[in-house]
Amino acid sequence: MQNTYDYDDIAREYLGMNVPAFDEIFPKTKKSETPSDEIPENILKYACYNAYVAYKAKDALTEKLKETEMLDIYNNVEIPLTYALYDMEQAGIMVAGDKLKEYGERLKTGIDALEKDIFAEAGHEFNINSPKQLGEILFGEMQLPGGKKTKTGYSTSASVLEKLEPDYPFVSKILEYRQLAKLKSTYADGLAVYIGEDNRIHGKFNQTITATGRISSTEPNLQNIPVRMPLGREIRKVFIPKEGCVFIDADYSQIELRILAHMSDDKNLIDAYNHSKDIHAATASLVFHVPLEEVTKEQRSNAKAVNFGIVYGISSFGLSNDLSISRKEAEQYIKDYFISYPGIKNYLDNSVKEAKEKGYSVTMFGRRRPIPELTSGNFMQRQFGERVAMNSPIQGSAADIMKIAMINVAKELKEKDLKSKIVLQVHDELLIEAYENEVEQVKDILKCNMEQAAHLNVPLDVDVQVGNNWDEAH
């Protein structure tokens, strides 16, 4: 509901009090200037302010939850979830240090080889990581098309380079270099910092950071592993179960599209899911007016982009870029999609209309997201607000369902006195470190609780895999 939940902000907003903020209690002084005996006193002061504000603000915050009709989701989802997240943080996840080191070395070899090729083609060395120097090489020395000069030089953003990539192998090498460098710094080198003495990473899971209600992770962030790249996916191989255990990965299949079917009550989409049809092929059949058995791979791929794009309020411009087609073709795809699924068109239009009237969107379970952008004087901001109004109820409902599933899975594991534990939650998947003699029980617990976390007009489907590392189980 707001950007921060810091105790000093809550004290000011709900209690009308000014209390010292974190930065005031822990000023940014050099270590040599900080007397060692001050640290315990500061920590005590910080803990006291946190506890005092939480205690004093309880009634005011409870009233706010009642007023916004979110007390139920707070009591029945968010509070029970804190225990599941605590257990996950305590459990952590094991990392094979030798494999992580080997992964980093392979990335370095690839980076060095690309660097050598890039310098050879450029005719001299330069700082590949400098947008200014790279821009001069591409658009100044090499005279490639599409260069847009700004005050700081030519733009070398990913979107600019991706347009050049199909025709210029040199640009392809630059993009690959960036990808490998990012993987090395963020994962190969970055993860090593967080490995504890027990060879496990004990990250932090946050339940109130994202606007949609999805869980996020920090220190480290394991949500953004680039799984579309083969080398990106390989980072999952360094995460391993402890001895005597395996990983069980349970992943919701197309949960957001299933929620869209339920919330829109679109008969064609509901029928496709209830008859276990290939949803992307079924969409292609409707949009391209061909029998289901005659749908081509390209048509299915394009329909898949439209299916997932609609959930995120994709524009014809965005779809044309994604599929490398003209904007006119993209407009026709979207138009035909809404003709095929009229319930979805009505639902999305009504979602925007209701959000404009109320000032917020709401999930199936009552979670609200304020959308102030809808009343902005800026056209681009209003468009952003409309996209949020369309996709937040869907994304937020998916987040709520995952949280409910986690609570129920964690509860049943304890009730059955099993030693297996949830160790990760990423996007639509749960990862369990399961003892080998508990595998079948855990698989049943996952599938049952995840598929029964919500009752929709279409079935929730969960894919369960077992493996000796995270990649193998996914």
Where are these regions (language model features)?
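Hydrophobic, well-ordered secondary-structure elements that form the walls
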Residues: 130, 213, 251, 284, ...
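Metal-dependent catalytic core segments for phosphate chemistry
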Residues: 8-11, 256-288, 368, 372-382
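Short Gly/Ser/Thr- and Asp/Glu-enriched loop/turn motifs at secondary-structure junctions
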Residues: 79, 129-133, 301, 423-427, ...
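C-terminal polymerase-core module
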Residues: 109-116, 120-172, 339-391, 433, ...
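Conserved "right-hand" nucleotidyltransferase catalytic core of DNA-directed polymerases
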Residues: 2, 6, 10, 14, ...
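Conserved catalytic alpha/beta cores of large enzymes that bind or transform nucleotide phosphates
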Residues: 236-260, 271-304
